[in-house]
Amino acid sequence: MRWMILLLILLLPSFAHAGCDDQPSNEVDWTNCNFVENLDLIGVGMANAKMSGVNLSLANLEKSQLNNSDLSIGNFIFANFSNSNLYSSNLQGANCNNANFENANLAKVNFEGANLFTSSFKGANLYEANL
């Protein structure tokens, strides 16, 4: 009987959620994670990521794939999103003070209520973005 229970436990799918120690990847769950160091995330693929409430101040996300990601109420002060793809992502209520979005794909991004003070959008695609 014990071996059957052990077998069932081993065969059941894992329902664990991703944590703050998980490597950046598509669909990563970094909800409310606090990254206090300057993270180097150049060119990472994090499409469909769940990062609501994340702290990525000073992070370098240049050339990253963040399309369809939830970045709402996140902290991105001085973050570098240059040449990144954030197509259809949610940055509602995010703090993007002094963030660099130069040459980024921001089409259909929701910036409603976001702090964009002194952020740079030179050459960015803002087609249907909600500012």
Walk through the language-model features, giving the residues of each:
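Sec-dependent signal peptide recognition
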Residues: M1-L8
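Sterically constrained small-residue positions within well-ordered secondary structures
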Residues: I9-L11, D21
